[in-house]
Amino acid sequence: MPELYPPLEPHAQGYLAVDAPHRIYWEESGNPRGLPVVFIHGGPGGGTHPRMRRFFDPAVYRIVLFDQRGCGRSTPHACLEGNTTWDLVADMERLREHLGIARWVLFGGSWGSTLALAYAQTHPTRVKALVLRGIFTLRQRELQWFYQDGASFLFPDAFEEYVAVIPPAERGDLISAYYRRLTGDDPVEQLRAARAWSIWEAKTSHLLPEETQITAFGEDTFALAFARIEAHYFVNRGFFATDDALLAGVDRIRHLPCVIVQGRYDVVCPMETAWALHRRWPGSKLVVVPDAGHAAFEPGIIKALLEATDGFRS
């Protein structure tokens, strides 16, 4: 297993009041005068974890983590009000200004890559470079593959558990059926749907099964925010004007350095999307990890991400 940088604690942390009722948790670790990097977590609704600080050389990087609206330590928990891609882009810009950072490196995987691309295309002059993993651009075909008809061919056993909470008559549109339950008035049904939705992703994220992640994703507090916020974004197509908005917007960031790390056997965000992004952005560096799935903490993915962040140290 490649070695992450040693565990470290934040030297600064706090809450940033954004649009009511939301308050965003943020923290800094590493070198206070170093190269700023912001870790953009997945989901949406996944939140941050202390282990995420460890992809960066703490002697070189000023490491910023934050929990997006409604998840992690941000409040209110699992809140969908005023929770869109463009609200999160605005939150990142407010946080950058709050911390007095001129330009920063964006580091994001899965939904984190979506938000990184959206932010960079909106504020290209505020970005030094991008490190992206498990590319997700929220096109309809990507959602259809994972949540309706595609990944089910590789994980029929896990998929059977995922669809079990939805009556057969509603299975023609599973995202919408889940959304109705996750936003309904029955807290028992909400939680049952949240756990099934979240465990489906946990069971498909690794090349080899990872029981600790399955357990963590099934925990009530995590699952409720993760599933509610994801379904909210997905029924709204990510709040993008067009299906291919992020790929179409690459011209605005083509001049920026970018490393794309992609697991060859990523079932959650298949390599086709990373390939499409790289084709649109020939100056990007695509690193395909031959023995990995989707998760950031698989050995080959860790190695490639560390090489990318070490490569940008100068």
Language-model features: where?
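Catalytic active-site module of serine/aspartate enzymes centered on a nucleophile-bearing elbow/loop
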Residues: S284-S314
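N-terminal cap/lid segment of alpha/beta-hydrolase-fold proteins
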Residues: P2-I24, E230
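A catalytic-pocket lid/entrance helix-loop region that shapes and gates access to the active site
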Residues: T125-Y178
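Conserved alpha/beta-hydrolase "acid-adjacent" motif
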Residues: V267-T273
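Conserved HGGG/HGGXW glycine-rich cap/lid loop of the alpha/beta-hydrolase fold
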Residues: V18-P76
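Short beta-strand/loop motif that positions the catalytic acidic residue
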Residues: I253, I260-Q262
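Conserved hydrolase catalytic core segment
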Residues: A102-R141
